[in-house]
Amino acid sequence: MSSSERVPCDFCGERTAVLFCRADTAKLCLPCDQQVHTANLLSRKHVRSQICDNCGNEPVSVRCFTDNLILCQECDWDVHGSCSVSDAHVRSAVEGFSGCPSALELAALWGLDLEQGRKDEENQVPMMAMMMDNFGMQLDSWVLGSNELIVPSDTTFKKRGSCGSSCGRYKQVLCKQLEELLKSGVVGGDGDDGDRDRDCDREGACDGDGDGEAGEGLMVPEMSERLKWSRDVEEINGGGGGGVNQQWNATTTNPSGGQSSQIWDFNLGQSRGPEDTSRVEAAYVGKGAASSFTINNFVDHMNETCSTNVKGVKEIKKDDYKRSTSGQVQPTKSESNNRPITFGSEKGSNSSSDLHFTEHIAGTSCKTTRLVATKADLERLAQNRGDAMQRYKEKRKTRRYDKTIRYESRKARADTRLRVRGRFVKASEAPYP
């Protein structure tokens, strides 16, 4: 692919496209790639790689150091798969990158050496040495060598300058776009600060060795929310500061996270245990203040509700018993006193008693309405059944059982054929007339 056949960038249409995004199926230059893939966290996960030197339409997968070419899978098969001589070429697989690497990291990834990158590295070494000397630490050869053992993260890239240049035929185009990207300051001032800022945005926090502005930015809304919450609690408690302390004490009394039974007393303005309920209520009742009131806890409320339900069931059962025994001989006083009252059906009994008990719960008016409705339904059902029987009888009277002749020709032939004892005579055996 010659210089006239260079693929333009799909985003700007001016520069030469050097990267291929698999997710967007787009060919981009380096500045447009930085602009497109720094939009959100999802776009940073897109895998990009260089464009094939042969076809210019597919991402590269193989690098040939002998011919200084980067080829896609199909072009590599066409070049190195059909010729036995090309099998001796030195090749290696090419992996794409994701994230938003800086210009220096891209240059190190592709084996390019930028002069600006060298100056930055020379300036960083004495600065790091000065910082370590201030802390009383010395950098020895073992510490410097241990940097190679660190596992790189998603945004760090291994420097492959020792493997030689791997940028293909368009080394000058890559160098020009890298320098433009470095001068524009899209990534950051020296290339590293931009990545650190993006890492802070992605991870939500920065190291303590930084400027501290990101940490302060995260702490300011949290402290403002705490102060606002404290002011709200003070307003609820009448403007005093005791409410906040009591709230914090209630939170810190159970550090293990267990659920302790606590009841908030509106009269005292603090929380107390359930065992103090009866004592406090007794104190309020003993004072005899007409304007004072107490709030029962959940257990007392449930007990009162259950006792009310039991009383209601007892009254209903008593009325039911009176109605059932109104038409019978009343038992003696001793028998009625000794007779136990049961609220549930005994073991082995059928559901007729439950149904009877449920029917008696309804009032007399409800029973009368139910009987009237049932009688009307039965009459309507009988009338509908009678009408259906009448229609059936009328239809039966008009029913005809006439025989239908399907084929007229067969009927005429059957009428003219000779019969012997009701059976047809074969044509071969029939006598001639």
Swiss-Prot record:
GO biological process: regulation of DNA-templated transcription
Domain CCT: 385-427
Subcellular location: Nucleus
Domain of life: Eukaryota
Cleavable signal peptide: none
Compositionally biased residues, Polar residues: 324-340
Binding-site residues for Zn(2+) 2, renumbered to this chain: C52, C55, C75, H80
TM spans (from-to): none
UniProt KW keywords: Coiled coil, Metal-binding, Nucleus, Repeat, Zinc, Zinc-finger
Residues covered by region (Disordered): 319-353
Claim: Disulfide bond is one of the keywords in the record: no
Family of this protein: Belongs to the CONSTANS family.
Protein name: Zinc finger protein CONSTANS-LIKE 15
Organism: Arabidopsis thaliana
